[in-house]
């Protein structure tokens, strides 16, 4: 066992003495059992994580029952909804790297034999996922689960995206104060990750098809007894993985990454999943995985389930309609869409895991014969603004919009753009360009949910587009193109767009171009000032120095002269 490094031999007597002091060693025989880390992320200010201490207790009990010795530790967490629209959002994406580094540190310092990861919200799940393939210790994931959808006084289903869009409607005078306050009070009625197909739930669903979580992980409600049963079930599977020495890199292969994107396409997941899954591929040592490959997957995978914010259906609706397993079963039966014979943490293949799944509500999950669209709900766009690519959730765009051509109105920050939208400087026919908000420029690639929500809230969702080197919340909908790469701070051509330039977003052809010649763009480049970091001290300064653009997953890259 790995843990023998800290508990066997005369030299480890001091370590054993300290282990006895933890109270986790109940009998001398416990030193002969596998040591299992519980990587938890309990935190009071994140509603998706307030109940995780209780879930960790369930995991501890089950691990002991299955023959292991549990040791819990915690990582940090950032609530993107609370951090939205101010400097706090600059810390959200960077927190992914802190979480990965923290988990790696504890796991490798103490030589655990297995790891039970309990994430839930936006950057916590991918951060832990990066740690799992980096440490490559037998591991399983079981998230905290989604919250219930809210209900307005008028009987309308609510999610957090409803409130963000209500801000624009209230400011515009099209929503009463009474209705506005009703939404605020009732949109988030329980603990759990926000109720729509936003980033947290998208990632927790992808964990099922990646093979790192048991079926039901993505959709079983946080407040349900079934969530606790999933925790127990996962603990027993983990002990089996430890016994058989099945590791994350045995499960997360190039085929698994392909299949994660396939599920993403079928359920119209958050564009943030692209960022995190590319980072995962890099961390797992999977080479030559680029955005063009994702478009190839989109062409063969139909869009089967349209969930909030793209519809009124919540994650609980998806669960009752058959869950992720029902969607995956459609992809298995489609043939050629995914690789169904890969191993998973259950010890079974993807095909075996979903063999008995079925669609219980064809309004929520469409059968493969009747998809929302024959192609997936996410697209990667390329062109002279985004030579390395950009991402759009086409499932969140009104179907009547196939090609959007408009006049650029440029901003060098999120706040400038929000002010212009709110004071009606932005008008019908504009393409809002927000740059210097990428991983390096932000820093931290902050989400642009406030401007997109204001656009939709004002009723301009089909008439105004927004493009950015920043990213979007999973709650974003409308003509919103993010992750433009290279970013402006890295010299990307989005920095060369001027007010009044004509920009064309062509969804069928997956292109994003500005109607300016290469010669003119090069002349503009000569006048472009050198980027200067916005933050000079602390973690964000170090992050700015090392982070790369979105097409890599926004990973940190060690300078080559240090590793050659």
UniProtKB/Swiss-Prot annotation:
Transmembrane segments: none annotated. [2Fe-2S] cluster binds at residues 121, 194. It is an enzyme of class 4 (lyase). Its cofactor is [2Fe-2S] cluster; Mg(2+). It catalyses: (2R)-2,3-dihydroxy-3-methylbutanoate = 3-methyl-2-oxobutanoate + H2O; (2R,3R)-2,3-dihydroxy-3-methylpentanoate = (S)-3-methyl-2-oxopentanoate + H2O. Gene3D superfamilies: IlvD/EDD C-terminal domain-like. Binds 1 [2Fe-2S] cluster per subunit. This cluster acts as a Lewis acid cofactor. One of its GO terms (biological process) is L-valine biosynthetic process. One of its GO terms (cellular component) is cytosol. Pfam families: ILV_EDD_C, ILVD_EDD_N. Pathway: Amino-acid biosynthesis; L-isoleucine biosynthesis; L-isoleucine from 2-oxobutanoate: step 3/4; Amino-acid biosynthesis; L-valine biosynthesis; L-valine from pyruvate: step 3/4. It comes from the Bacteria. The modification N6-carboxylysine is found at residue 123. Mg(2+) binds at residues 80, 122-123, 447. GO terms for molecular function: 2 iron, 2 sulfur cluster binding; dihydroxy-acid dehydratase activity; magnesium ion binding. The active site is at 473 (proton acceptor). Its EC number is 4.2.1.9. Keywords: 2Fe-2S, Amino-acid biosynthesis, Branched-chain amino acid biosynthesis, Iron, Iron-sulfur, Lyase, Magnesium, Metal-binding. Functions in the biosynthesis of branched-chain amino acids. Catalyzes the dehydration of (2R,3R)-2,3-dihydroxy-3-methylpentanoate (2,3-dihydroxy-3-methylvalerate) into 2-oxo-3-methylpentanoate (2-oxo-3-methylvalerate) and of (2R)-2,3-dihydroxy-3-methylbutanoate (2,3-dihydroxyisovalerate) into 2-oxo-3-methylbutanoate (2-oxoisovalerate), the penultimate precursor to L-isoleucine and L-valine, respectively. NCBIfam families: ilvD, PRK00911.1. Homodimer. Belongs to the IlvD/Edd family. This is Dihydroxy-acid dehydratase. It comes from Listeria welshimeri serovar 6b (strain ATCC 35897 / DSM 20650 / CCUG 15529 / CIP 8149 / NCTC 11857 / SLCC 5334 / V8). The gene is ilvD.
